[in-house]
Curated annotation (Swiss-Prot):
NCBIfam families: rplA_bact. Part of the 50S ribosomal subunit. It comes from the Bacteria. This is Large ribosomal subunit protein uL1. The keyword tRNA-binding applies. SUPFAM superfamilies: Ribosomal protein L1. The gene is rplA. It comes from Streptomyces coelicolor (strain ATCC BAA-471 / A3(2) / M145). GO terms for biological process: regulation of translation; translation. The keyword RNA-binding applies. Belongs to the universal ribosomal protein uL1 family.
Length: 241
């Protein structure tokens, strides 16, 4: 057995699989069981009781994480004229129009988020096959198709992330790095949870959040008590559930 396998088994042995952990307790345990030697990512995964094949059960939106993700996103903006200048001034990493659209169509993907002005969406729409599968296609519902490109860039750079339930009814959120203070990770988790609950489709029946788990880049998943929506910074407090 490899040293890596032994480390994972030892980490997994510290987790009670019959228990749903409070967020603060899960964060501390995730750090304790992380086997990476670098500043790993902390992620939360939700299994939702929705059928994403049905339009009225799609869960999609954005959330502003109060403490960001620990990574500054590279933002590409499709804009011209004054709006292009505003995007650059706001800190956009890549700004352009026709030539840039052509570059992306040929496979340029050195960015994490895309913003476009409404007047260019007729052309940007042709990039659906490239951007769509990667969750990068600009959309008015997520604020990434907008005339106010400066605000969109500032929001994304400040920790705003976009999410969408996948075909298996799962949602994944990066809520920070293992170097983050425990409180910051829990507060980021709370912001994500609050937004997911707010977006519950009226057509969804039965239990909405079926499962939730927190993990690090190279660590085991820790079952979360997603029913706990208040007093998230308390480890053990049954009255807070």
């Amino acid at each position: 057995m490899s040293k890596r396998s032994k480390s994972l088994r030892a980490a997994d042995a510290k987790i009670d699989r019959d228990k749903l952990y409070a967020p603060l307790e899960a964060v501390r345990l995730a750090k304790e069981t992380s086997t990476s030697k670098f500043d790993g990512t902390v992620e939360v995964a939700f299994r939702l009781g929705v059928d994403p094949r049905k339009a009225d059960q799609m869960v999609r939106g954005t959330v502003n994480l109060p403490h960001g993700t620990g990574k500054t996103a590279r933002v590409l903006v499709f804009a011209t004229g004054d709006r292009a200048e505003a995007a650059t001034a706001a800190g956009a990493d890549i700004v352009g129009s026709d030539e840039l659209i052509d570059e992306v169509s040929k496979g340029r993907l050195d960015f994490d988020a895309v913003v476009a002005t409404p007047d260019l969406m007729g052309k940007v729409g042709r990039l659906g096959r490239v951007l769509g599968p990667r969750g990068l296609m600009p959309n008015p519902k997520t604020g990434t198709v907008t005339p106010d490109v400066a605000k969109a860039v500032n929001d994304i750079k400040g920790g705003k992330i976009e999410f969408r339930v996948d075909k298996h009814s799962n949602l994944h959120f990066i809520i920070g790095k293992t170097s983050f203070d425990d409180t910051k990770l829990v507060e980021n988790y709370g912001a994500a949870l609050e937004e997911i609950l707010r977006l519950k489709p009226s057509a969804a029946k039965g239990r909405y959040i079926k499962k939730a788990a927190l993990s690090t880049t190279m660590g085991p998943g820790i079952p979360l008590d997603s029913n706990r929506t208040r007093n998230l910074l308390v480890e053990e407090d049954p009255a807070a559930v």
